[in-house]
Amino acid sequence: MPAATFFRRLSAIALGSAMLFAGAQAALAQQSKEDIEKIIREYILKNPEIIEQAILELRKRQEEAENKSRTDAIVQNKKLLTESPRGVVLGNPKGNVTLVEFFDYNCGYCKRALNDVSELLKNDPELKIVLKEFPILSPGSVEAARVAIAVRMQNPAKYWEFHRALLGGRGEANGAVALAAAQKVGLDIERIKKDMMSPEVAATLKESEQLGKALAIGGTPSYVLGDELIPGALPYDRLKLAIAQVRKCGKLDCPN
């Protein structure tokens, strides 16, 4: 932003704020807009650190606004996030805390998080986990997601075994690799090939895409826990703590 524009905006803000004070109205009436701008300019030049303070405050307010907008979106879409039949439910379907994970089969951090999710399932009997296919990294990711959804349609009980085989594998995930993983766990490959192109698969991908946009999810993995979004992978201990906090007070950070 050009300096002149910056100063003019600051001047406008200062002038607007000053008008709120009745005692200052008489003094302002005797000063021109140019005089006020000059005073502000001189003050800023003598105290340049105020610009950094203003920028930090602006960023803070923007972050707070973004977090509020995201929280509102989570609340508005809570049923789709946690109860949609198009999500894959792991763990306790009636658990007292639900962790939703958006993932991509070609996401390296998702691969690392696989063991953490497995540990959570093993160690927390009151946890419900919902997996959301969110293929954003490549066309191969979309192909793999289509196969995965077809696996869920054919045999939900086999999904977790398939998921671990595909996400835990090396190399790029795509349709062929995903089909091989499905065959390995004993599923009907011809039926999967047919179901991959079904309206249900398209609707599932569309649902995840719309949720991702509503929550402003820009990468994977991303977790929804309580009414908050956790962008990026967290190690097991931090995920466990976050779940405990939500269980305790409904938020990621409970007041002391």
Predicted regions and their residues:
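C-terminal cap of thioredoxin/glutaredoxin-like
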Residues: T5, L28-R41, A180-N256
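Short pre-active-site segment immediately N-terminal to redox-active cysteine/selenocysteine motifs
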Residues: F103-N106, G219
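Bacterial N-terminal signal peptides that target proteins for export
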Residues: P2-A14
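Structural alpha/beta surface segment adjacent to cysteine/selenocysteine redox centers
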Residues: V100, K111-Q183, D188, K193, ...
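N-terminal targeting signals for export/organelle localization
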Residues: P2-T5, A22, A26-K79, P255-N256
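Hydrophobic core
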Residues: L15, M19-G23
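The canonical Cys-X-X-Cys-His
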Residues: C107-K111, Y223-V224
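A short beta-strand-turn-helix
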Residues: K79-V97, L121
